[in-house]
């Protein structure tokens, strides 16, 4: 799981770096100051917000696994679970200037989905989401309304596609300012032709086989990236 840095750290445009409380005790050692020091050498960090003390209360918020962030519109989407505490979610939103849109999501066997980034992805002009996982109609409609109001085209995925990590994608930007959508080959292969064509209207798709990681670690492409939005140092 140490190849999933997005669960313990996130970087923000205003210079904030957040450190997060982790559910699994063996993963708490991943929060390394050496990583933060490397980032500080290359980027401007104004403040470090350390939420990890919440582990003493046995409450958790596992970074951008727990929260899918619409950074442009400052919205934090989160499915509440033992790894995603609503109080900590609201604390994050108050500090970072986000609005929380929270809900409960379950898989097809009615088991809680503990990481939001498994069932949805928010990009610049679209969102990939498994709406079937949200049982409560009010919560589902609130999510749909929020996405539509922020100008996102909703691309719906099924439970079967969710199981193949089709929700675990991340839109990134190259040094040439080209937008790309990154996912695993398993996720890509699960998409139907219409879904692929719709996504490719917005950006190219990049995929790579991650089967061993997906099988052993339970995460996929998005989990392996902790995107840096900090301003680069000029010196």
Locate predicted features.
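The feature marks the mature, well-folded catalytic cores of soluble enzymes
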Residues: 1-235
